[in-house]
């Protein structure tokens, strides 16, 4: 929690105002932020200085694991995070690749599960990683990559957190996640949960202990219409004790995650927070 608040304060104190062409708004911006999550000791990085909705974050990552390309599928597993980008983004609404309501195109999990090859075949990056790690193999390239410039025009949004690199040292699994851009007030509490969850669940289904997850953010920013709430409300609050995150131990394989797993298989114990803050969202 401290590293989250430290980053927020750093942006306020040291950030540079940058015009964002996509949203038409200014952002207070810093370059390079590194956060570390102690998954091994169960230090769950859920923000307590405002109410945070961890279920939507986990549900979204499960949708990526399943390779979903429809906002409707994400809603069914418990998150509405893709509704706006799939249905309210003018550039995407006028894109000939869009298939209709709720279509997201070839983004995130689609790239992770079916990266297109020139010969018409597809690469399932995630399955390769899970298969390797389950056999104790780390080829120094166990990388789940969502960033495919050749297909940016075929999706509603470029990936923000685009790379997840797993590393095995003995029986302990580590994760390095890289994010090109982060809306810190709205998105970071979400992304912290996702990085923690991804290492925890992959360690479980591959039979390893979870170590630490390292989260690099390149462009960390606060939009101009979020700054007052961050300065006068969230940064004035004292953080509360971190909760505990539990995963159903019966989840033992990638197939389990693809088929029967629901949000009922995850639990957060002892979460207390300050009141919610309604930060503006920029499509």
Swiss-Prot record:
Pathway: Pyrimidine metabolism; dTTP biosynthesis
Family annotation (InterPro entries): Thymidate_synth/dCMP_Mease (IPR045097), Thymidate_synth/dCMP_Mease_dom (IPR023451), Thymidate_synth/dCMP_Mease_sf (IPR036926), Thymidylate_synthase (IPR000398), Thymidylate_synthase_AS (IPR020940)
Biological process annotations from GO: dTMP biosynthetic process; dTTP biosynthetic process; methylation
Name of one Pfam family that matches: Thymidylat_synt
Subcellular location: Cytoplasm
Catalysed reactions listed for this entry: dUMP + (6R)-5,10-methylene-5,6,7,8-tetrahydrofolate = 7,8-dihydrofolate + dTMP
Residues making up the signal peptide according to the UniProt record: none
NCBIfam families in UniProt: PRK01827.1-4 (NF002498), thym_sym (TIGR03284)
Known function: Catalyzes the reductive methylation of 2'-deoxyuridine-5'-monophosphate (dUMP) to 2'-deoxythymidine-5'-monophosphate (dTMP) while utilizing 5,10-methylenetetrahydrofolate (mTHF) as the methyl donor and reductant in the reaction, yielding dihydrofolate (DHF) as a by-product. This enzymatic reaction provides an intracellular de novo source of dTMP, an essential precursor for DNA biosynthesis.
Protein name: Thymidylate synthase
Organism: Aliivibrio fischeri (strain ATCC 700601 / ES114) (Vibrio fischeri)
Source taxonomy: Bacteria, Pseudomonadati, Pseudomonadota, Gammaproteobacteria, Vibrionales
């Amino acid at each position: 929690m401290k590293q989250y608040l430290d980053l927020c304060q750093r942006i306020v104190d040291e950030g540079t105002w940058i015009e964002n062409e996509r949203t038409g708004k200014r952002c207070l911006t810093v370059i390079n932020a590194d956060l570390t999550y102690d998954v091994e000791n169960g230090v769950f990085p859920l923000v307590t200085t405002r109410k945070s909705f961890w279920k939507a974050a986990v549900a979204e990552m499960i949708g990526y694991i399943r390779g979903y390309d429809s906002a409707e599928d994400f809603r069914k597993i418990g998150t509405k995070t893709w509704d706006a980008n799939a249905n309210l983004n003018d550039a995407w609404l006028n894109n000939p690749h869009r298939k209709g309501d709720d279509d997201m195109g070839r983004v995130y999990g689609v790239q992770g599960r079916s990266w297109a090859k020139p010969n018409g075949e597809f690469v399932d990056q995630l399955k390769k990683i899970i298969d390797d790690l389950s056999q104790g193999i780390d080829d120094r390239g166990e990388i789940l990559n969502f960033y495919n410039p050749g297909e940016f025009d075929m999706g509603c949004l470029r990936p923000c957190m685009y790379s997840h690199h797993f590393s095995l040292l003995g029986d302990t699994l580590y994760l390095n996640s890289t994010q090109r851009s982060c809306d810190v007030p709205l998105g970071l509490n979400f992304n912290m949960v996702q990085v923690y969850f991804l290492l925890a669940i992959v360690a479980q289904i591959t039979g390893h202990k979870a170590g630490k997850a390292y989260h690099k953010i390149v462009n960390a920013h606060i939009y101009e219409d979020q700054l007052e709430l961050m300065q006068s409300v969230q940064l004035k609050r004292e953080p509360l004790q971190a909760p505990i995150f539990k995963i159903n131990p019966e989840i033992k394989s990638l197939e389990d995650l693809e088929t029967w797993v629901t949000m009922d298989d995850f639990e957060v114990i002892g979460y207390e927070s300050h009141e919610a803050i309604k930060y503006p969202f920029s499509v």
